[in-house]
Every structure is written in C-alpha cells, then in structure tokens.
Amino acid sequence: MKFNPFVTSDRSKNRKRHFNAPSHIRRKIMSSPLSKELRQKYNVRSMPIRKDDEVQVVRGHYKGQQIGKVVQVYRKKYVIYIERVQREKANGTTVHVGIHPSKVVITRLKLDKDRKKILERKAKSRQVGKEKGKYKEETIEKMQE
C-alpha cells in the first residue's frame, strides 16, 4: 500500500532514476555498511564509500578475510576498485575487478573534519530516534502526582 502520492513504485521509473542519477545522488546510493566495531564506536550503520577507506568483501566471488584499501570509486559504473581484488586478462595484464559497495563492509574510515561532522550528525539523529516517544522518569513522577 502506497501512502505518498508523489513517490512512484513503478519498476521502470525507479530503474530509470537509478541509472540516470546525477553524481551527488550516486554518492548516496554507493553507501556501504560499517563493521560491527565501527558501528558500536560511532553509532552509525552505513556511510557513502570513499577512496582510501579500508573494506572487506563479504559477498560474491571475491569474499574473504583479507582487507583492502579502496583504490577508486567509479560512480558512473556504480562500482569500487579494491587494492587486492584483481584478475588477469588474456594478454597477461592485471586489472582491478569492480565490486558494488553494498557487497563490502567498511573496516576503517578515512576521517577528515567533514566526515567527522557527518558521523556526529548521523549519530545524533539516531539518538533522537531512540528517545522519541519514551517517557522520562521525571515526567512519569509528575503524572502520578
């Protein structure tokens, strides 16, 4: 059941918007979940992926325990290239294999002041969401008086 008349659920329209999305929206779509440790530390579930983040592939042919650094984020193709995820071409040269960001987990973030600000903002909004709709002890005591 659709509630918002301004949001479409038409598959072809959603595919069109996905593949014709501008770069600033592709950044948002190309987000990856954080590892359990980082999620605990920052109280944030996922972040848009970025060059120099360290990730671990958790789905597909290249999944495994080794952790690699993101070499390139290719927004046009919706893929990221990771340090050790390569294959050999027929002529013998090695090339990076593109992996979708949803199939990796971020194990270390490259932090700068802007990214720290984003983490704080996301954590704050998450905290507000947890407290929403709950009575505090003082309000309960006042109600009982």
From Swiss-Prot:
* UniProt cross-references to Gene3D superfamilies, sorted A to Z: 2.30.30.30
Locate the Phosphothreonine modifications and list their residues.
Answer: T139
UniProt subcellular location:
Cytoplasm
**Hey, what's the signal peptide range on this chain?**
none
Q: What's an example GO BP annotation here?
A: cellular response to gamma radiation
Query: Which chain regions cross the lipid bilayer?
Result: none
Classify the main location.
cytoplasm
Region of interest (Disordered), ranges? 1-21, 122-145
- Looking at the record's lineage, which domain of life comes first? Eukaryota
What terms describe the molecular function in GO for this protein? mRNA 5'-UTR binding; RNA binding; structural constituent of ribosome
Entry comment on modification after translation = Ufmylated by UFL1 in response to endoplasmic reticulum stress, promoting reticulophagy of endoplasmic reticulum sheets.
PROSITE patterns associated with the record: RIBOSOMAL_L24 (PS01108)
Q: By its UniProt entry, which Pfam families does this protein fall under?
A: KOW, Ribosomal_L26
The yes or no answer to whether the keyword Ion transport is present is no
A single cellular component GO annotation: cytoplasm
Tell me which UniProt keywords the record has, alphabetically: Cytoplasm, Diamond-Blackfan anemia, Isopeptide bond, Phosphoprotein, Ribonucleoprotein, Ribosomal protein, Ubl conjugation
Task: Note the position of the cross-link Glycyl lysine isopeptide (Lys-Gly) (interchain with G-Cter in SUMO2).
Answer: K136
Which disease does its entry mention? Diamond-Blackfan anemia 11: A form of Diamond-Blackfan anemia, a congenital non-regenerative hypoplastic anemia that usually presents early in infancy. Diamond-Blackfan anemia is characterized by a moderate to severe macrocytic anemia, erythroblastopenia, and an increased risk of malignancy. 30 to 40% of Diamond-Blackfan anemia patients present with short stature and congenital anomalies, the most frequent being craniofacial (Pierre-Robin syndrome and cleft palate), thumb and urogenital anomalies.
Q: Which family does it belong to?
A: Belongs to the universal ribosomal protein uL24 family.
NCBIfam families in the cross-refs: rplX_A_E (TIGR01080)
Function in brief: Component of the large ribosomal subunit. The ribosome is a large ribonucleoprotein complex responsible for the synthesis of proteins in the cell.
Quaternary structure, per UniProt, is: Component of the large ribosomal subunit. Interacts with DHX33.
Protein name as annotated? Large ribosomal subunit protein uL24
Native source organism of the sequence: Homo sapiens
